[in-house]
């Protein structure tokens, strides 16, 4: 059977592949410590679980919902935006999806025509480029330098812009680097996008997970002109420990949101009703558990960062948000005789029994990604093994 060129040209998600490999080795009895997947190790808070159970027991979750999401969930998203973004959104400016990843997909399918260019700063989350290609667009990768905390400048963006540029992808806090753009940096980028009539895709999924006094500023909150140029992608997965529930959403101008909902109507229809009722409680219920989880991530970061910096050949920029470390391992590879980062991470997996994610899938062939969304004992032991591997 001949598969489509579309799928043959598609890359496998390196994060999912690394996680699957680690699980397979664990199933064989290997003592694998996996630092691969980007999901909190906490269970979903009880008040959210209870809201989901109630929606099943009283029958509300038994039926289809509107494709773009429950009115109650849209109202909760509006209240959330009023609190954390400083502005209101109308129901027709919101569409809910089966995960933020699917919101991203419908956005690209809704706005990108064949040949349109999408600027993506590198390092980048692994699915951006392939989703652009699925929409027949052209990803244009702009390197964000480590000495600038993995952040691009307006000058770099302007140098990459052509008359085919349609979208700028902006992910802050970033997966995989954990960097956060300042208000001043975002204002400069936002004004540039407005002046050049370039859409901003703001992936804000890690916006509540910031540490050590750093602040998250939503680019869409900076001015009405920037807001109209921006589509915000967010969800409940990372902030509320709900990765398995698969609820994301997009907020933006009504025309784009309607187009995204139209695509969902011909593909997934509505997201799970049970998960939507759970998301209502997540966004509108008590938020104390969010802060306790954030504090736990902050403690892990502050504990593990100096330990990782002591691993020979690992050069680490301390992240400001999300829950990843993204060390440069060029020197480490040279010390161990490797020139390919994927081969290097494979050797670490086989010999040290620590599962990392190759930086190649993030557009960073000299880096690896470690998730610190796991307990401190596991993190300490993993770094201990990495150090022993490098010193052997």
Where are these regions (language model features)?
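Active-site phosphate-binding strand-loop segment of PLP-dependent enzymes
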Residues: 144-214
């Amino acid at each position: 059977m001949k598969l489509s060129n579309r799928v043959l040209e598609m890359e496998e998600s390196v994060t999912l592949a690394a996680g699957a490999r680690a699980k397979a080795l664990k199933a064989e009895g290997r003592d694998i410590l996996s630092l691969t997947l980007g999901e909190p190790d906490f269970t979903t808070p009880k008040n959210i679980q209870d809201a989901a159970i109630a929606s099943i027991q009283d029958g509300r979750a038994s039926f289809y919902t509107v494709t773009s999401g429950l009115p109650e969930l849209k109202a909760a998203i509006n209240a959330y935006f009023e609190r954390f973004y400083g502005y209101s959104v109308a129901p027709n400016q919101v569409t809910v999806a089966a995960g933020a990843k699917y919101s991203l997909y419908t956005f690209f399918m809704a706005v990108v025509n064949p040949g349109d260019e999408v600027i993506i700063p590198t390092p980048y989350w692994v699915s951006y480029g392939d989703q652009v290609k699925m929409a027949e667009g052209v990803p244009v990768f702009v390197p964000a330098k480590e000495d600038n905390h993995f952040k691009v400048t307006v000058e770099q963006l302007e140098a990459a812009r052509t008359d085919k540029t349609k979208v700028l992808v902006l992910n802050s806090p970033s997966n995989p680097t954990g960097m956060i753009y300042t208000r001043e940096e975002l204002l400069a980028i936002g004004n540039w996008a407005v002046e050049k009539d370039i859409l901003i895709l703001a992936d804000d999924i890690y916006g509540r997970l910031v540490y050590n006094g750093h602040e998250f500023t939503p680019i869409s909150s900076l001015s009405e002109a920037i807001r109209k140029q921006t589509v915000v992608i967010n969800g409940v997965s990372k902030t509320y420990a709900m990765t398995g529930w698969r609820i994301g959403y997009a907020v933006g101008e009504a025309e784009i949101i309607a187009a995204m909902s139209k695509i969902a109507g011909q593909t997934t229809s509505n997201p799970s009703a049970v998960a939507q009722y759970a998301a209502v409680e997540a966004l509108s219920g008590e938020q104390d558990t969010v802060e306790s989880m954030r504090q736990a991530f902050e403690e892990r970061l502050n504990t593990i960062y100096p330990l990782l910096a002591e691993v020979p050949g690992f050069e680490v920029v301390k992240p400001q948000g999300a829950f990843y470390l993204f060390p440069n391992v060029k020197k480490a590879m040279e010390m161990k005789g490797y020139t390919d980062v994927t081969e290097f991470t494979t050797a670490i997996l086989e010999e040290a029994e620590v599962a990392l994610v190759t930086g190649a899938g993030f557009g960073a062939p000299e880096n690896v990604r470690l998730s610190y969304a796991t307990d401190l004992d596991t993190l300490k032991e993993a770094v201990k093994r990495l150090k022993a591997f490098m010193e052997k």
